[in-house]
Amino acid sequence: MSRYIGPRLRIIRRIGKLRGFTRKKPFRRSFRGRGALQGKVIPPGQHGLTKLFKSRPFDSNESDYLIRLKVKQRLRYNYGITEKQLVKYVRQAKKMKESTGQVLLQLLEMRLDNIVFRLNMAPTICAARQLISHGHIHVNSKKVNIASYMCKPKDVISVSMKQSSLKLVNRNLQEYSQKMSAYKKRLERTLAYVLFQRNISPNMANALEYINQGKVQVNNRKVLLPNYLCHSKDMISVKTDKGIRKFQFSE
């Protein structure tokens, strides 16, 4: 089966972030100026910056065909399938009585390489396909080296008992747990989570409403970003229905 070996960062700059395609992030290809385009990813090519300025921040000037083409390309690159394979899955989905789009996603999600990726045994679907092709994955105690193998309910997916297989999968699982712990620590410092944790708002939706309405100040400055990272000794004041509540944030 053919696989994509070209530049991956260029693809995600064009059609958006794809978790199953690559771990790369276009940090150096984002607009560093001020305004509504700050932080936006610059499209690839010589005239990428010109295309970014032509795009409107709250309205799309893309045609319907271009929107559907991008969605199709996202499916192809994310799941690592060819155009011929995608057409085959679409034809299978059309034969079902249920919604074609929902059945198509179910067929793609039941592929063995995708399930190995969802189990966090590999960082990307491409890496999961490599694990399968090298014989590290077993299905129902039998070695399967076909990445497009369609799994069924109650199938048991396990790792080969070889030392190299266990070492490789354990390393990927440890990297995933470290990444999740870092995300959790970062989430605990966000302004919306701090308001919810201090019982100022009953839920996250109410905390977001306080922030969007401009009722939250940090160090006597109004903050409108829910993902604002609080630092230790920051003074946070919230204007609620029962009055103004102030507290000091501590990690």
UniProtKB/Swiss-Prot annotation:
Its main location: plastid. Residues 110-170, 189-251 form the S4 RNA-binding domain. The keyword Plastid applies. It is found in: Plastid, Chloroplast. One of its GO terms (biological process) is ribosomal small subunit biogenesis. Keywords: Chloroplast, Plastid, Repeat, Ribonucleoprotein, Ribosomal protein, RNA-binding, rRNA-binding. Pfam families: Ribosomal_S4, S4. Gene3D superfamilies: Ribosomal Protein S4 Delta 41, Chain A, domain 1, RNA-binding S4 domain. One of its GO terms (cellular component) is small ribosomal subunit. GO terms for molecular function: rRNA binding; structural constituent of ribosome. It comes from the Eukaryota. NCBIfam families: PRK05327.1. Part of the 30S ribosomal subunit. Contacts protein S5. The interaction surface between S4 and S5 is involved in control of translational fidelity. Belongs to the universal ribosomal protein uS4 family. One of the primary rRNA binding proteins, it binds directly to 16S rRNA where it nucleates assembly of the body of the 30S subunit. This is Small ribosomal subunit protein uS4c.
